[in-house]
From Swiss-Prot:
Organism of derivation: Synechocystis sp. (strain ATCC 27184 / PCC 6803 / Kazusa)
E.C. number: 2.7.7.1, 3.6.1.-
Domain of life: Bacteria
Cellular component aspect of the GO annotation: cytoplasm
Stated name of the protein: Bifunctional NMN adenylyltransferase/Nudix hydrolase
Motif placement: Nudix box: 233-254
Length: 339
C-alpha cells in the first residue's frame, strides 16, 4: 500500500455528516492529494432515513471545510441500486473516472461496521484503508434524537456548522412532516414488539404500463404520505398473491379494465426483497408487470389508500424520481427495461 495517493474516495450517505465522518475525511486528506466524496442514495424521496437531498448534504459538508480544503475536494452522487451491485458499481466507476482519468493511485477509505458495509469489498482495483470505528458517532442515533427533539443527545456529535444547519432545518415543513412520520414508525414497530418473532410483511404491487405510461397513485397514508407510488398493499390471508394484487389495483385506481383482461395481461413478475427497502420493517413485495395494448389510456380514479390515481409518462417518472416511494422507481425500472 502506498503512503500517499493521488485520490482518496469516501462513500457515504452522510445523513447527517457528523464528527466521525469529519475524522475520516481529515484522514483522507492526509493520505491523498485530492478526495472524492460520493454521496449515496441520490434522488431518493425524503424520509426519516434520508431526510436531506444531495445538494443539501453537499452544502452541509462544504460548510465544515475551509476554502483551501474545498479546492482539494470533489463531490459525486450515485443512486441506489438495491437489486444490482453491478449497476451501482458501474455508476461509481463512471463517475470516478471523470475525475481520476484512470489513475491507479487511488485509495478507498471506510470502516466495515456491519453487513451494510459490504460495498467496501467491491473495488479490487483500488487500495483500501480501514479507518477504524468511532462508536460515539452514529447517524442513525443522531437522526433518532433529532426527530425526538433531544438536542443534548446529538448537538455535540456534529460539527458546529452542521448543528446550525439542523437547528435551521427544524423550522421547515419537511422536518415537521418527518417528525410525524418518525412517531408513526415508532408506534408501528412498538405494536409488533411483543410478537414472538420479528414480523415479515408480504405485499403486492402492480406495474401497469400502456403506451409509455405507468399507472401511479399518490399515497394518503403514512409512511410516505403524499409520495408517488405503485398501486399495491398488504396481502390478505384468504387470497393468492395475484388476487391480492388485482384487488389493491382496483381499490386504489378504479382502473376501467375488466379483471379477466388484467389477469391475462400479466407478462412478468418478480420478488423485491431488499432487507432495508421499507422503514416499516422487513417487507417483501411481489410485483406484477401488466402490459396493456396501445390505445386510449383507460379511465382511473384514486380510491382507498390513494389520494389520486393517474397515468404518468415514463419521462415524468424520471423527472419526479425524488417523489417516488421506497424502491418503487427501481421496481418500475426492472420491468420497463425489458420491453
Amino acid at each position: 500500500m502506498q503512503t500517499k495517493y493521488q485520490y482518496g474516495i469516501y462513500i457515504g450517505r452522510f445523513q447527517p455528516f457528523h464528527l466521525g465522518h469529519l475524522r475520516t475525511l481529515n484522514l483522507a486528506l492526509e493520505k491523498a492529494e485530492q478526495v472524492i466524496i460520493i454521496l449515496g442514495s441520490h434522488r431518493v424521496a425524503a424520509d426519516t432515513r434520508n431526510p436531506w437531498r444531495s445538494p443539501e448534504r453537499m452544502a452541509m459538508i462544504e460548510a465544515c471545510l475551509s476554502p483551501q480544503i474545498l479546492k482539494r475536494v470533489h463531490f459525486l452522487t450515485v443512486r441506489d441500486w438495491l437489486y444490482s451491485d453491478n449497476l451501482w458499481l458501474a455508476a461509481v466507476q463512471q463517475q470516478v473516472l471523470k475525475i481520476t482519468g484512470g489513475s491507479n493511485s487511488v485509495v478507498v477509505l471506510g470502516h466495515r461496521k456491519d453487513a451494510s458495509s459490504y460495498y467496501l469489498n467491491l473495488f479490487p482495483q483500488w487500495d483500501y484503508l480501514e479507518t477504524g470505528h468511532y462508536p460515539d458517532f452514529s447517524s442513525t442515533a443522531i437522526r433518532g434524537a433529532y426527530f425526538e427533539g433531544k438536542e443534548g443527545d446529538y448537538l455535540d456529535k456534529v460539527p458546529p456548522a452542521i448543528a446550525d444547519y439542523l437547528q435551521t432545518f427544524q423550522k421547515s415543513e419537511r422536518y415537521i412532516a418527518l417528525c410525524d412520520e418518525y412517531q408513526f414508525l415508532q408506534a408501528y414497530k412498538q405494536a409488533w414488539a411483543t410478537a414472538p418473532y420479528a414480523p415479515t410483511f408480504i405485499t403486492t404491487d402492480a406495474v401497469v404500463v400502456q403506451a409509455g405510461h405507468v399507472l401511479m397513485v399518490r399515497r394518503q397514508a403514512k409512511p410516505g404520505l403524499g409520495l408517488i407510488a405503485l398501486p399495491g398493499g398488504f396481502i390478505k390471508q384468504n387470497e393468492t398473491l395475484v388476487e391480492g394484487m388485482l384487488r389493491e389495483l382496483k381499490e386504489e385506481t378504479r382502473l376501467k379494465v375488466p379483471l379477466p383482461v388484467l389477469r391475462g395481461s400479466i407478462v412478468d413478475s418478480h420478488v423485491f426483497d431488499a432487507p432495508g427497502r421499507s422503514l416499516r420493517g422487513r417487507t417483501i413485495t411481489h410485483a406484477y408487470f401488466i402490459q396493456l395494448p396501445g390505445g386510449e389510456l383507460p379511465a382511473v380514479k384514486g380510491g382507498d389508500d390513494a389520494q389520486k390515481a393517474w397515468w404518468m409518462s415514463l419521462a415524468d417518472l424520471y423527472a419526479q424520481e425524488e417523489q417516488i416511494y421506497e424502491d418503487h422507481f427501481q421496481i418500475i425500472q426492472h420491468f420497463v427495461s425489458k420491453v
